[in-house]
């Protein structure tokens, strides 16, 4: 329970005042532009609907839980239905992608008229058996900078590596070692709090599943932050097809120069 309350307070889920404090008082990163406020509100609301736990597995069962039990299509409303409690067990990219979809649904519902089309939602919803590098979910689930490449391709946000620019609510791909690709040790998360020498993030974590975790930054070799700034661009999801480079990360390792090029980041 304490884990859940820490997460809620850090992301400002209790009230707008807490939100403003947490998003601007970390001492690291810039204030939230007014145009992005509605996205952060949707993200906080979406995150509040996840229960802690459920177990962590990178298994067929976890993939089926995401694609067949948690993500449904309502033929009557012609809109998606996300049953978050059905998405167990889970793994890091399934947790973050489901949070992205739920937040996008909340954001879209708050607009004067729907922005994300039926065709776009059908492209965004994961399919069981979808391969890495195929379609939006296949991109987001790929090794390396999968989600960063998806967001860059859609023009839905920005990617960067500088801790000083990061703020709560940014997606954060952690690399525990220098390896990127076939033998990488990575973890897709959402930044909750930058505590200086340590960092708190939300994801599906070993062994418990959904929840927040705090680790020393000294354990982290590198990070890629992804910030959603234009959620309306997810309406372009049907244009996301196959990405051979992302698919190849199951078989090869790559360097940061390639990662930055595909993610729209500049080399330092």
Locate the predicted segments by residue:
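N-terminal capping segments
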Residues: 22-142, 263-268
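Glycine-rich, flexible loop segments associated with nucleotide phosphate handling
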Residues: 84-89, 184-189, 245-247
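Boundary at the C-terminal end of the N-terminal hydrophobic targeting segment
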Residues: 18-20
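Bacterial N-terminal signal peptides
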Residues: 7-16
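Low-complexity, Gly/Ser/Thr/Pro-rich intrinsically disordered linker/tail segments
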Residues: 199-268
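Positively charged n-region of N-terminal signal peptides that target proteins for export
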Residues: 1-4
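...with weaker cross-activation on analogous glycine-rich loops/strands in unrelated enzymes
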Residues: 118-209
């Amino acid at each position: 329970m304490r884990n859940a309350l820490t997460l809620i307070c850090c992301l400002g889920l209790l009230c707008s005042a807490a939100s403003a404090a947490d998003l601007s008082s970390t001492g690291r990163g810039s204030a939230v532009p007014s145009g992005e406020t509605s996205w952060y509100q949707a993200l906080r609301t979406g995150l509040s609907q996840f229960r802690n736990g459920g177990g962590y597995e990178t298994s067929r069962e976890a993939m089926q839980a995401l694609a067949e039990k948690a993500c449904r299509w309502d033929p009557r409303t012609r809109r998606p239905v996300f049953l978050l409690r059905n998405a167990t067990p889970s793994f890091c990219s399934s947790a973050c992608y489901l949070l992205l979809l739920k937040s996008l649904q909340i954001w879209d519902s708050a607009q004067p008229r729907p922005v994300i089309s039926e065709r776009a939602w059908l492209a965004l919803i994961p399919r069981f058996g979808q391969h890495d590098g195929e379609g939006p979910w296949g991109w987001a689930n790929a090794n390396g900078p999968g989600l960063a490449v998806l967001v860059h391709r859609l023009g839905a946000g920005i990617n960067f590596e500088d801790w000083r620019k990061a703020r709560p609510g940014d997606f954060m791909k952690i690399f525990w070692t220098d390896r990127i690709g076939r033998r990488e040790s990575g973890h897709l998360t959402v930044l909750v709090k930058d505590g200086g020498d340590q960092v708190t993030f939300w994801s599906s974590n070993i062994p418990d599943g959904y929840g927040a975790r705090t680790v020393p930054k000294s354990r982290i070799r590198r990070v890629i932050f992804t910030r959603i700034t234009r959620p309306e661009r997810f309406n372009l999801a049907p244009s996301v097809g196959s990405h051979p480079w992302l698919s190849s990360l199951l078989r090869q390792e790559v360097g940061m120069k390639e990662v930055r090029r595909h993610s729209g980041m500049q080399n330092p």
